[in-house]
Amino acid sequence: MPQAIHISPIDNVVVALHPIAKGTLVEVDGLSVTALEDIPQGHKMAVKPIRNGENVIKYGFPIGHATADAEPGTWMHTHNVHTNLSGEVEYSYNPAPDLAPLPKVAPEIFMGFRRKDGRAAIRNEIWIIPTVGCVNDIAKKMVADNQDLVTGSIEGLYTFTHPFGCSQTGHDQAQTRKLLAALVRHPNAAAVLVLHLGCENLQHDQFVEELGEYDHDRVKFLTCQDVDDEFAAARSILKELAAYAGQFQREPIPVSELVVGMKCGGSDGLSGITANPTIGRFSDMLGQRGGSTVLTEVPEMFGAEGFLMDRCINHDVFVKAEKMINGFKEYFISHNEVVYDNPSPGNKQGGITTLEDKSCGCVQKGGTAPIMDVIGYGDPVVTKGLNMLYGPGNDLVSATAMTAAGAHLILFSTGRGTPFSAPAPTLKISTNTPLAEKKSGWIDYNTGVIADGEKTIDETAQGLLDLVIRVASGEQTKAEKHGFREISIFKDGVVL
């Protein structure tokens, strides 16, 4: 079993794949270094002398600079490494020399649902979407009271509550309206009840305009203040929606029609070595089969955005990526926040030292394929292949944004563990085996076997593709079995 990994030949640190005790001789890539102190799993150890102010190199990239001299065998972490990041950067387009679509592969088949507009779906559910937080509990009671309608091919009746839709103005309200309308359009929702209170800022006419053309049999509206008994009214509407949703049956669909979101959270020092490269390889494999993937968490690209921007398929896509990256930095600066204050306490405990360290691991989820498009918050994926999406690092906000973009399911890597799920089925992928064993009720797939020396990234990626096909065909994720699913909306404005 390997003790550590030297990710790039030019790195001046290695990453401990397992805890390394002080005095242990570590041999990797022809290097022999004795640990001068205990090195926790996922943390970095110097393998070359690093002087005060010199860059610490991991993934072949500077992840910060040393704040004190360090000899080989020294633990390199927050006590002796600091970020190099500052504010906005002027980027230039330097396309990678090998920038080209990956060779195509015949797509496998999954058993999904074909909607009347031609789109594919992997779930056949009825959703209740409240437009304002005032009706949240009403929506929950409607779900509880109408579970008898979940029969035949209908796989669930759910609501996605939130505190917004009123006391918002301008761009902030428009962003909420856009996100909710995008959820209404999601193909996994066979039928949707949009639930209004009546007096909220987010008015019915505004929402219908935002929604655009829609199937009147698939989407129904109810304004609670307009009826004597909203529960009786909802019962009648939900019966109609159930009759509509029940006509869909699973049928063979090529995986080329899948849209898969990619996210990491509760990351550790192994995220960029095991789980995220596995997801990246999966992304390449799905792209080769004609499918689409979505990468977001813009603040967790800071410091590693060059890896992605040089892979933009053309200059127009590069310009959109540049605007997205610097636009998000300006969002931070406008709120008097530094752009590099990101790694959480859990990230640091797991071995992530700086935002560059976190970002270099995060972008591994993007694989090697060209970036085909950059889309805004609440916008749909319209281009096959790898897409970048405007969204924050926050787990639930970004997972909701990927769902709104049309992701059928989400791959979520974690080194610390998290139970949540977006409205789209959310597969939890552990970076290390101890987490998979400890939280077996949360984790769907373990890539810690890479660190254990049992499997290669190619093997775990193939296993992940097989699992995605099974989940797309109806196999439930751990979170689905627990009934976990929720949304969170990206708010950026005052509260009236």
What annotation goes with each model-predicted range?
Residues 1-409, 416-419, 424-496:
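Metallocofactor- and cofactor-centric catalytic cores in central/energy metabolism, strongly enriched
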